[in-house]
């Protein structure tokens, strides 16, 4: 569990790693929108990356949680096309074909500002791909414990 308030540590990610059918389905819907240069925001332990790795030519991973960032660097250390950033998305003018927020936006308190920043970082006709937990009325202690600010 998350022992310290406001410090996300990703303890629940190992459970979501096992959702292979869901991840395969999700990737079948979004792969055609990825393009050659993508950014994934909050990739956690890299589960999603494993499903789309072969598609783009260049991948930038923005993981602000130090422990998860270090694990990502170790897991994909031999990759020539993955760049790692231990921070939130930096505004990069028209740099990406797509930006992924897969089960991440709910962790960002100022989500609207984040979406604007991401949009400004997309190339013309780029894709902003977002997956979030639905049904705000289901917001629970679990959401709080895993660092969710809200459901949508």
Predicted features, each with a name:
Residues 103-107:
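A short His-aromatic
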Residues 112-127:
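A short glycine-rich, Lys/Arg-flanked "PGG" loop and its adjoining helix->strand segment in the class I
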Residues 59, 128-129:
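A short hydrophobic/small-residue beta-strand
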Residues 47, 68, 108, 125, ...:
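Feature marks short, surface-exposed loop/turn motifs that line or immediately flank catalytic pockets
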């Amino acid at each position: 569990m998350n022992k310290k308030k406001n410090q996300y540590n990703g303890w629940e990610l190992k459970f979501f790693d096992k959702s292979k059918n869901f991840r395969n389905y999700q990737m079948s819907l979004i792969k055609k929108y990825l393009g050659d240069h993508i950014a994934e925001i909050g990739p956690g332990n890299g589960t999603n990356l494993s499903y789309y790795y072969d598609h783009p030519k260049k991948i930038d991973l923005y993981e602000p949680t130090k422990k998860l960032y270090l694990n990502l660097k170790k897991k994909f250390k031999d990759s020539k096309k993955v760049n790692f950033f231990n921070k939130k998305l930096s505004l990069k003018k028209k740099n990406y074909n797509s930006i992924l927020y897969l089960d991440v936006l709910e962790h960002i308190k100022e989500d609207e500002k984040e979406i604007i920043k991401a949009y400004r970082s997309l190339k013309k006709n780029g894709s902003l791909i977002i997956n979030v937990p639905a049904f705000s009325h289901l917001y629970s202690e679990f959401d709080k414990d895993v660092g969710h600010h809200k459901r949508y």
